[in-house]
């Protein structure tokens, strides 16, 4: 047995049962001494015939743990020549002592501090505890350490697979009479690669909801009708951008990104609220960014949106329009149509909000049906960092801002 600083150790977990097939080096039991816990492996492959020890029992070097069947005669003969007994037990045996605690325990066994619950979780994920750096007291491995290690492993596996993955397109022998060829633009090719990366690396979930924008629309129509410069008209999107900036201040996790930091998965929050807006151009979709949206009023946001949209469509985007990575993206299809859709998150962001066409719907106010203008909202989010409860709270907050635009003035 490896030196764990004591002659006697306590059995705290039995990892097998009678009839189990075990291989050499599979863990049989977990024992705990004064300094650490350790899993004791089988010295041979076979079937568990009998388990000798029980939880809470004190054992020492040479104690018989279990009896295995299905071992070749040479192994049996070798083991039968030595009789092992464990302390504080009335049982003795000269059977194949293949599960004995002995000084020749596999060199790969390393002392680790971990509870049985953590060890079971590590076995479930097929993770070796000796590969994990514990963050608990005196280096104890916690449940969070195992989960973090698993997430990092998945993260690295995905990164490796992405390096080997190309955008696959259909290949076949066709004639020009059968098909018409339309080549993708450089923007569309670049976009397709980014979309593939997002779809493969981010577990998407989409939360659908509707916001009552009846009062907002009444105000917007009145404001626009009084404008002398009609190029400065306000759109519904302007108010949504402002509402989202408020929500990002209230729920900063949506304004971050996932990173692998010091071998741990972490959410890094962006210092500024920079919202990307999907713009449809002849070359494909572009996502210029409005920086520091939370510091701007409705008129400033409207002016910035008009400028970057015109630059995107005329292929005159400045480096300043895209140099700061967006922290959140909004995709607006309301001017085209549709009721709901599932927008794909822009990697490495954590969420994206989709807007569809507003429709008048009947609303029951306890006395009668009244018409309400309802704006469909589709919030896609990264389920690794954001759970469903947080997503509902976020979209509910956005709805509140849009239903009563006085909140946007605060």
UniProtKB/Swiss-Prot annotation:
The record, for PROSITE patterns, names:
BIOTINYL_LIPOYL, LIPOYL, PSBD
The UniProt record lists the Peripheral subunit-binding (PSBD) domain at 113-150
Q: What class of enzyme is it?
A: transferase
- Keyword Metal-binding: yes or no? no
**Where do the segments described as Disordered lie?**
81-100
Q: Which free-text remark accompanies the cofactor?
A: Binds 1 lipoyl cofactor covalently.
**What EC number(s) does the entry state?**
2.3.1.12
Give the function comment from the record. The pyruvate dehydrogenase complex catalyzes the overall conversion of pyruvate to acetyl-CoA and CO(2). It contains multiple copies of three enzymatic components: pyruvate dehydrogenase (E1), dihydrolipoamide acetyltransferase (E2) and lipoamide dehydrogenase (E3).
Q: What is this protein called?
A: Dihydrolipoyllysine-residue acetyltransferase component of pyruvate dehydrogenase complex
